[in-house]
Curated annotation (Swiss-Prot):
Formation of pseudouridine at positions 38, 39 and 40 in the anticodon stem and loop of transfer RNAs. It comes from the Bacteria. Homodimer. This is tRNA pseudouridine synthase A. It holds the Pfam family PseudoU_synth_1. Its EC number is 5.4.99.12.
Amino acid sequence: MIVNFKTQRVIQNFSKFLLSLNAITDSGLSILNMTEVDENFDSRFSCNSREYEYWILNTKYPRPTWKNRTFWYQHRIDVPRLEAELELLKGEHDFRSLAKVASLKGRSTVRTILDVKLERSLELEGLLKVKIRANGFLHNMIRILTGTLLEISNGKRKDTNVLEILSSKDRTIAGITLPPYGLYFIRAYYDSYPKIDFMYSHLDFLK
C-alpha cells in the first residue's frame, strides 16, 4: 500500500532512512520502498484504480498451513461458469446489491470494472484467485461479489447470473459475505505518476 507524507528537511539518503523507519515500526508492518514525488501527489485521491485478489482454496480437506490465509471451500465449483460470470462484470455497473447497506449513506454505487479474471495457482492445487481491478470499490463489495459468484458456480443459483443480481439493486438477492481472510490488496495505480510503478516491481510474492 502506498502512503505519502511531508518532511521538514530534505531526505539525503533514502536507503538509510528506510532502514531507520523499519527499525521503529510494528512487527506486522514493513516499509519496502520509497521515492520522492511532487507536492500535488496524494496517495488516496491521486489513485485512478485499485487491484485486489480473493483467494479460494477449493479442496476436499482443509490445509492447516493455509488457515486464515484463504477461504477454504470444499464444494464443487463450475470453473467455466465462474469465468463466464467474471466476464459479465467488465465495464460500468451499479453495485448497490453487492455492498454493505449501512455503508452507503447516499453515496454513488456505480463503479467501473477495468479487469477481472480467475487465476489458478501453479504452486498449490485447488487455489483459485479472483483478480479484480476497478476505479473504486464499495464496502464489502469484493467479499459479497465472490460469495455470490460461488453460489452461482456451485449450482445453488444456476438459473441466474450476476448481471440480474446487479440489476435488482437489492442486497438480500445477492449471496453471502465471505470472511476478510482471503482478501488481498495488491496495488494502486497512478496514471499521472508513472515513476511510482517501480515500487511494485519486486512485489511478486503473491504470484
